Curated annotation (Swiss-Prot):
It comes from Schizosaccharomyces pombe (strain 972 / ATCC 24843). Residues 14-26 have a biased composition (Basic residues). It comes from the Eukaryota. It holds the Pfam family Ribosomal_S5. Component of the small ribosomal subunit (SSU). Mature yeast ribosomes consist of a small (40S) and a large (60S) subunit. The 40S small subunit contains 1 molecule of ribosomal RNA (18S rRNA) and at least 33 different proteins. The large 60S subunit contains 3 rRNA molecules (25S, 5.8S and 5S rRNA) and at least 46 different proteins. Interacts with snoRNA U3. Interacts with MPP10. Component of the ribosomal small subunit (SSU) processome composed of at least 40 protein subunits and snoRNA U3. This is Small ribosomal subunit protein uS5. One of its GO terms (molecular function) is structural constituent of ribosome. PANTHER family: 40S RIBOSOMAL PROTEIN S2 (PTHR13718:SF4), RIBOSOMAL S SUBUNIT (PTHR13718). Residues 75-138 form the S5 DRBM domain. Keywords: Cytoplasm, Ribonucleoprotein, Ribosomal protein.
């Protein structure tokens, strides 16, 4: 009598089908190589731009989130809230999910992403990408004597969204973050260690609350304190400087 095949193998077994699905799924999980589609992305991948501060200096728009991943690999994200939103249609109410995500490296860079999608996971994934595209530098300063590393906001700044107003006030070293949980987590991801905050309005609306905090923190980079008054030579933008290289790379892509 012929020996029977092991269970799960051979014709009619279930083992082969499971292994086949695993191999197909592994290909989907493989990371694809980044192929830049913008001029800024091609310069970044070619190594012509050394830091993300050069992009901010010339106010170049970031259209690819991979540029942020290239310069800031240690970004952390925090899902602040996911709320269902509805839209009335002829077929009835269409429910979608709106995600608010704050992303930052705790070292002077923070972004806010908001995205709506039919599924929660898709909304969070899209909000993370939007947060990377909207990432902004945060200028830090001192409360008193300039000793050690910058630890607080350089000046008083305010941000407003809807009825919510958030004010950030410099604090002495060791004071910590005197803020609501939403603003506190936002400032932690921004890299601010000590800060007093004031908030007014309907702070229960978390979306407007975190938007106002982001608007206030973004203003710190637009204020020049006396130590930044020195004149600096302002040359061509990287896109103008490396125009010849961009013409060559366009043919490759």
């Amino acid at each position: 009598m012929a020996e029977s095949a092991p269970r799960g193998f051979g014709r009619g077994g279930r083992g082969g089908r499971g292994r086949g699905r695993g191999r197909r799924g592994a290909k989907r999980d493989e990371e694809k190589e980044w192929v830049p589609v913008t001029k800024l992305g091609r310069l970044v991948k070619a190594g012509k731009i050394k830091s993300i501060e050069e992009i901010y200096l010339y106010s170049l728009p970031i259209k690819e989130y991979q540029i942020v991943d290239y310069f800031l690999p240690r970004l952390n994200d925090e899902v602040m809230k996911v709320v269902p939103v509805q839209k009335q249609t002829r077929a009835g109410q269409r429910t979608r999910f709106k995600a608010f995500v704050v992303i930052g490296d705790s070292d002077g860079h923070v972004g806010l992403g908001i995205k709506c999608a039919k599924e929660v996971a898709t909304a969070i994934r899209g909000a993370i990408i939007m947060g990377k595209l909207s990432i902004m530098p945060i200028r830090r300063g001192y409360w008193g004597t300039a000793l050690g590393d910058p630890h607080t906001v350089p000046v008083k700044v305010s941000g407003k969204c809807g009825s919510v107003t958030v004010r950030l006030v410099p604090a002495p070293r060791g004071a910590g973050l005197v803020a609501a949980p939403v603003t506190k987590r936002f400032l932690q991801l921004a890299g601010i260690e000590d800060c007093y905050t004031q908030s007014r309005g309907s702070t229960k609306t978390l979306g407007n609350f975190v938007k106002a905090a982001f608007a206030a923190a973004s203003l710190t980079y637009g204020i020049l304190t006396p130590n930044l008054w020195a004149e600096r030579p302002f040359g061509q933008t990287p896109i103008e400087e490396y125009a010849d290289i961009l013409m060559q790379t366009e043919k490759k892509y």
